[in-house]
């Protein structure tokens, strides 16, 4: 889906890519090719200090979207020498929050957004592909937890 996106050394910032809208994990496992395609977005940020290739942490927000405490953690990751990719699943779908409607953006949708970003970021010459992690808060924690599951 994103095979043609190539990032160059030093390239960071806002990234647009393709993802899809599987409603639940069943659709990821059995019908991902039938899920509607969307334009997804995120931010790749490198530490100010240090020399790559950098380990990377994919950061996934919770039901109330990105908030101040998430950014505090991200700053700590950057200061510790990690690159981060901040997944923006809600913005990609025009949703501000799922607190009142958890079905408007599901964990399955957010997982596909994260893994599609992984496909792109793992080809970046400044990323150490042997050191890739994921963290999430609340709903994003669900994405993080299930990302290690092998069916």
PLM regions: where:
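Alpha/beta-hydrolase fold nucleophile elbow
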Residues: 127-138
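N-terminal cap/lid segment of alpha/beta-hydrolase-fold proteins
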Residues: 1-52
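Short substrate-entry loop that stabilizes the transition state in hydrolases
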Residues: 50-54, 59-96
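Short glycine-enriched nucleophile-adjacent loop
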Residues: 141-151
């Amino acid at each position: 889906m994103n095979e043609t996106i190539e990032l160059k050394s030093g390239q960071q910032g806002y990234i647009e890519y393709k993802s899809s809208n599987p409603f639940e994990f069943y659709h990821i496992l059995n019908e991902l090719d039938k899920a509607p395609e969307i334009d997804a977005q995120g931010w790749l940020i490198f530490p100010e200090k240090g020399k790559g290739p950098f380990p990377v942490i994919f950061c996934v927000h919770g039901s109330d979207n990105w908030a101040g405490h998430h950014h505090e953690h991200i700053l700590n990751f950057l200061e510790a020498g990690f690159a981060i990719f901040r997944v923006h699943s809600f913005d990609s779908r025009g949703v501000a929050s799922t607190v009142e409607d958890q079905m408007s953006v599901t964990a399955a949708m957010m997982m596909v957004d994260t893994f599609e970003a992984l496909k792109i970021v793992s080809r970046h010459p400044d990323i150490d592909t042997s050191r890739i992690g994921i963290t999430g808060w609340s709903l994003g924690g669900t994405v993080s937890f299930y990302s290690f599951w092998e069916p």
